[in-house]
Structures are given as structure tokens and as C-alpha cells.
Swiss-Prot record:
The gene is PPP1R1C. It is found in: Cytoplasm. GO terms for molecular function: protein phosphatase inhibitor activity. Residues 55-75 have a biased composition (Polar residues). It comes from the Eukaryota. This is Protein phosphatase 1 regulatory subunit 1C. The keyword Cell division applies. Residues 25-109 are annotated as: Disordered. May increase cell susceptibility to TNF-induced apoptosis. Keywords: Cell cycle, Cell division, Cytoplasm, Protein phosphatase inhibitor. One of its GO terms (cellular component) is cytoplasm. Belongs to the protein phosphatase inhibitor 1 family. The lineage of its organism: Eukaryota, Metazoa, Chordata, Craniata, Vertebrata.
Length: 109
């Protein structure tokens, strides 16, 4: 086929750049430190900073913004809440109720 033939489809492909811009590389470097750089940073921290990293008091958690609070803290449900949920969902788990009835029958025998 000839290069100027109307049947030939040509795509515009951007030139591949093997390296990213230096500004972008610097931003990535700042955002994602390597494990080695973390070790170096931790070695240079004064002991006072490490003491402040201890367990937070309840007052500190209340003063912190929602983004600063730990999201992984588990708060167990209260007994009142569990009883309320169980009352609402009595028939929501029939297999659980069947298992309870079977255990009670086995105890009677």
C-alpha cells in the first residue's frame, strides 16, 4: 500500500518519555520515603519526640481533628446496644436460633 492511500489508518502516538519531570520526581520522593530513609530519620529524632509518641489520652483524641484521629480504634458495643439490636433482629438469623434450640434439647437429654 502507498503511504497516502485512503485505506491506511494512521494513529497519532505520543513519544514515550523514559524519565519523568524532575519536579514530579521530587514530589514523589517527598511523599513516599524509602524504608532506609525512615530508619535514618528515626535515628536522628531526639528522645523527647519519642516520649510524646506514647499512648494518647482521651482529651488529646477529642481535640484532634477527624483526620488526625485513629480510624482503626475498635469500640465494643454496649450491652444496651446489643440487646436493642437483638430485639430488632430476632428473626434475622434463623440458623443461629436453630443452633441454640438444638443445644438446649441436647442438654435436656
Amino acid at each position: 500500500m502507498e503511504p497516502n492511500s485512503p485505506k491506511k489508518i494512521q494513529f497519532a502516538v505520543p513519544v514515550f518519555q523514559s524519565q519523568i519531570a524532575p519536579e514530579a520526581a521530587e514530589q514523589i520522593r517527598k511523599r513516599r520515603p524509602t524504608p532506609a530513609s525512615l530508619v535514618i530519620l528515626n535515628e536522628h529524632n531526639p528522645p523527647e519526640i519519642d516520649d510524646k509518641r506514647g499512648p494518647n489520652t482521651q482529651g488529646e483524641l477529642q481535640n484532634a481533628s477527624p483526620k488526625q484521629r485513629k480510624q482503626s480504634v475498635y469500640t465494643p458495643p454496649t450491652i444496651k446496644g446489643v440487646k436493642h439490636l437483638k430485639g430488632q433482629n430476632e428473626s434475622a438469623f434463623p440458623e443461629e436460633e436453630e443452633g441454640t434450640n438444638e443445644r438446649e434439647e441436647q442438654r435436656d437429654h
